[in-house]
């Protein structure tokens, strides 16, 4: 008999906990557990002797929790507290069965959105969740990813019992310039990357939950910087200028009509073009946002921040950007949560509520108040360009790297070549909408799918020739960036202008033997990207087969869904092609890491998502060596371990199956 805590049984449990989340549990065993288990009957099953479970049960019995069949937003303080309470209960469970029993119990009694978020964060962070692949959120809460028109057709198909696949278009029309890049912000894989990163690094995380999230503040900067740089690369690919930053004293130029509805709560609010920022009741005044920004800029200019107890902390040192990231977000890691104020989180609330700032029309939260939907709104990228420029102000205060800072003595990059074609195209992708529609008892499910177009690229391989003149093996870090060569007007960019627009393509470690080394690296092995997640149907089928067959299940290749979709590694480019500089920097791996030459594959997406419960593997600043200003390109040209090659990316306009 296979133990109930093996991967197959755990995957089976999670599948059934998340299936048709707005309806009672279908699995008979879990359904019985939900109605017979008492979370506080035996408190020895928890690491905290049931303190969290008692608190949550008290709130539940006093009817002080958010009702079921109601919208949930992480930016709503009270709802976030409830989610954190449930997460704490699950996180304190000593064994999988206890976590599973609690999850079944609270699934039937708490708000569905709070439950899903808490379960996802628990599986991601708890050791008990190792080996489990969380189903793609676009199949669990499809309303957050799917246009209303498609959801309506899915309901119609269900009611008439007719199978159907419905094409989902990007919201808007060609009259709207922003429509040209809607495929980026509205890509369901990019939405998943964004929401999952914020589950991997929650702004409400406290180390009392079990461990420290290493370099969380710096990763907050780097992940959003890369999203913004990638968005700008897509704009260049569509004859558009880079996105402009948001200004609190200016209008919000682009409106947005989400064409999406909550499962319960009505339509997502719309925002017309050229809206003036308004004070938002219960969130902030416009003046508060300007004050917060000024306080942060003052800290950068002074080179220090003031902690809660009044002492000053120097930010003009290597981990300064880490401290700044925690303050700008702001997270529980902030050195002073009350001063200067929460710029990022409050800004999301401000933008989300501009359609109904005083609550006159009882509108639900806007798309900016959910990490799942935020990147759909063009104002998301304006907001992050604005914050990115604040971070740049900080990094520009550091002295540029010198020849000695950059060199890897005795190592030279002799040649960079690409095997294969750098070709992008759009393909089609189907996902099931079975969980979007309601089911009665004994009513058969109907095969209903949404069909979306997604950016993709042909696979390619980097061939990098590196010579090691040291007459002994060397451990090396290989860093690969893609940098634009010119702006939208065809004006050539120097390296200092281009560096902030560069896309991180890969970062990995390798051993250099004495003499000539040929490093071959496939695009699909990038530490920046993740493959497509298995569909919910596939996860259910594999888990059921493993449980029934009594064998285990290994889905470790898909365990993390934080990372840029691997098909979006390259920017779209144009049919006539666009030239980019491919930069390869080979740096001293012994200096870059803790020096242990063990497994440095790190399985997947460590570049932008780190490694759970461990130190970030690279000691260098994120973005090194391009994160500091470069007043003279010749410093880079003068070191042998950094080289660049001109490459051309071509877009094939033919839609592929």
Swiss-Prot record:
Task: Give the positions annotated as glycosylation sites.
Answer: 167
Q: List the disulfide bonds.
A: 483-502, 562-609
Look up keyword Transport and say if it applies: yes
Which Gene3D superfamilies does the record cross-reference, listed alphabetically? Di-copper center containing domain from catechol oxidase (1.10.1280.10), Hemocyanin, C-terminal domain (2.60.40.1520), Hemocyanin, N-terminal domain (1.20.1370.10)
Q: In which tissues is it expressed?
A: Hemolymph.
- Subcellular location as annotated: Secreted, Extracellular space
- Report the outcome of residue 24 to D: Depending on subunit
Q: What is this protein called?
A: Hemocyanin
What is the species of this protein? Palinurus vulgaris (European spiny lobster)
Traced from the root, the source organism's taxonomic lineage reads: Eukaryota, Metazoa, Ecdysozoa, Arthropoda, Crustacea
């Amino acid at each position: 008999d296979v133990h109930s805590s093996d991967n197959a049984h755990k995957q089976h449990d999670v599948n059934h906990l998340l299936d048709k989340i707005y309806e009672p549990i279908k699995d008979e065993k879990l359904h019985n557990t939900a109605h017979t288990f008492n979370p506080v009957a035996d408190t020895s099953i928890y690491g905290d002797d049931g303190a969290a479970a008692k608190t949550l049960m008290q709130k539940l019995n006093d009817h002080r929790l958010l009702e079921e069949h109601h919208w949930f937003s992480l930016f709503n303080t009270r709802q976030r507290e409830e989610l954190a309470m449930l997460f704490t209960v699950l996180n304190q469970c000593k064994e999988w069965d206890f976590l599973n029993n609690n999850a079944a119990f609270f699934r039937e009694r708490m708000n569905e959105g709070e439950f899903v978020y808490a379960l996802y964060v628990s599986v991601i962070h708890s050791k008990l969740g190792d080996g489990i692949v969380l189903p793609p959120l676009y199949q669990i809460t499809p309303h957050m990813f799917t246009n209303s028109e498609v959801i309506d057709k899915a309901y119609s198909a269900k009611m008439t019992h007719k199978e159907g696949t419905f094409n989902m278009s990007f919201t808007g029309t060609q009259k709207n310039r922003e429509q040209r890049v809607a495929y980026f912000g509205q890509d369901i894989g990019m939405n998943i990357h964004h929401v999952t990163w914020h589950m991997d690094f929650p702004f409400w995380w406290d180390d009392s939950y079990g461990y420290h999230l290493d370099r969380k503040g710096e990763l907050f900067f780097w992940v959003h910087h890369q999203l913004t740089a990638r968005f700008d690369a897509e704009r260049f690919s569509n004859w558009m200028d880079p996105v402009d930053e948001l200004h609190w004293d200016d209008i919000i130029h682009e409106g947005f009509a989400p064409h999406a509805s909550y499962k319960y709560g009505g339509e997502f609010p719309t925002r017309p073009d050229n809206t003036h920022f308004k004070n938002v009741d219960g969130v902030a005044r416009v003046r508060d946002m300007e004050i917060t920004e000024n306080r942060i800029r003052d800290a950068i200019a002074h080179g220090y921040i003031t902690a809660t107890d009044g002492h000053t902390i120097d930010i003009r040192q290597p981990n300064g950007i880490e401290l700044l990231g925690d303050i700008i977000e702001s997270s529980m890691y902030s050195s002073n949560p009350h001063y200067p104020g929460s710029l990022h989180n409050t800004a999301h609330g401000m933008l989300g509520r501009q359609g109904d700032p005083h609550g006159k029309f009882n509108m639900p939260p806007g798309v900016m108040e959910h990490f799942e939907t935020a990147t759909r709104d063009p104002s998301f990228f304006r907001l992050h360009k604005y914050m990115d420029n604040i971070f740049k102000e900080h990094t520009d205060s550091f002295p540029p790297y010198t020849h000695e800072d950059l060199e890897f003595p005795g190592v030279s990059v002799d040649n960079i070549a690409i095997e294969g074609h750098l070709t992008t195209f759009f393909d089609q992708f189907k996902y099931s909408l079975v969980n979007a529609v309601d089911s009665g008892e004994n009513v058969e499910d109907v095969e209903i799918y949404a069909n979306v177009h997604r950016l993709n690229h042909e696979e390619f391989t980097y061939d990098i020739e590196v010579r090691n003149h040291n007459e002994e093996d060397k451990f090396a870090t290989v860093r690969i960036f893609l940098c634009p060569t010119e702006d939208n007007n065809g004006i050539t960019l120097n390296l200092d202008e281009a560096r902030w627009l560069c896309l991180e393509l890969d970062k990995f470690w390798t051993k250099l033997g004495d003499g000539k080394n040929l490093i071959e690296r496939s695009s699909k092995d990038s530490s920046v990207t993740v493959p497509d997640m298995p569909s919910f149907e596939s996860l259910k089928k594999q888990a059921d087969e493993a449980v029934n067959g009594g064998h285990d299940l290994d889905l470790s290749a898909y365990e993390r869904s934080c990372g840029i979709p691997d098909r979006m590694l390259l920017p779209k480019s144009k049919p006539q092609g666009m030239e980019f500089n491919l930069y390869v920097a080979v740096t001293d791996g012994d200096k870059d890491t803790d020096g242990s030459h063990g497994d440095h594959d790190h399985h997947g997406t460590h570049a932008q998502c780190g490694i759970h419960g461990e130190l970030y593997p690279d000691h260098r600043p994120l973005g090194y060596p391009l994160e500091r200003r470069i007043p003279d390109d010749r410093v880079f040209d003068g070191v042998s371990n950094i080289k660049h090659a001109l490459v051309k990316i071509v877009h094939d306009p033919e839609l592929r199956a």
